[in-house]
Amino acid sequence: MSQIKNNFIESVGNTPLIKLKAASEITGCNIYGKAEYLNPGGSVKDRAALALIKDAQEKKLISEGGIVVEGTAGNTGIGLCLLGNSLGYKTIIVMNDNQTQEKKDTLKNIGADLRLVPPKPYKDDGNYVKVAGRLAEELKSTNNNGVVWAN
């Protein structure tokens, strides 16, 4: 039976456990898989995104009209953007330009401000995570509703 949720945030988590029949029969015990792909963003990373945003809200680092910045390979950014949309936050995602076109298109289609950078090792200042951190710091002086580097 489907459950109606009051808002987008309530749809994150509470994904079902599914009994893995063959594995259960082979082992003689019940084996279950957690169906995290049924989160609204299609990934367990939706849970991490929600925790990051809730933490920022509790610390009063962001309010409606604020900006969430993240350097990501995709799934966390998708979760952050979907949650940000529902809470009135702008989401800026910094990612390597060699990520899959599907992830880039998904992020653009759900409203992320996508910033692509060439792939660089973490020790390099041009690494997407470091670029995201600098961008968040720069934006803090221009937004009164808060800027959070989700990192």
Predicted regions: what they are:
Residues M1-N151:
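PLP-dependent amino-acid enzyme catalytic core
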